[in-house]
Regions:
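Non-catalytic accessory regions flanking glycosidase/transglycosidase catalytic cores in CAZymes
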Residues: 1-142
Length: 142
């Protein structure tokens, strides 16, 4: 296949491709600067901008860190029954919507209770971290 483009000749309007944004840290959305950033994105074109975050099923207290986030959406009680808690996920999506941004949902990563390698679960990312230091319990399938 050969594609030729004459840059001196208009070919038509350019459809916006800037409508989709994303990040690793879901909890950053409701932090001061995350909320502010979502506001700027929503101002681009209200209700036409989408945002996707990783880690929506990761077990944890809901605080953000570099390359990490958590929602505690799925845990298990002492009898190994599922416990679903969408409080943090709702807070994330409510922050998107408050700012005129639509969630582009990626149901991702492994709750600790379902991981075949639950410990260590959380990683502490650094630019020099090797993959075997990062791929901890959150990344293991059941």
């Amino acid at each position: 296949m050969r594609i030729e483009i004459d840059a001196a000749k208009p070919s038509g309007p350019l459809k916006p491709i800037w409508r989709f944004f994303g990040a690793d840290e879901p909890n950053y959305a409701y932090m001061k600067h995350g909320d502010e950033l979502l506001g700027h994105l929503g101002d681009l074109k209200k209700d036409q901008v989408f945002f996707r975050a990783h880690s929506l099923l990761v077990t944890g207290e809901g605080t953000h860190a570099l390359k990490w986030g958590s929602t505690n959406a799925y845990t298990e009680d002492a009898q190994v029954n599922p416990v679903y808690d969408w409080t943090i996920v709702d807070r994330i999506f409510d922050t998107y919507r408050k700012n005129g941004v639509r969630p582009y949902v990626q149901i991702g990563f492994m709750p600790q209770a379902l991981s075949v390698k639950p410990e260590p679960y959380r990683h502490h990312w650094t630019p020099k971290a090797k993959y075997d230091e990062i791929y901890t319990g959150w990344a293991y399938p059941p």
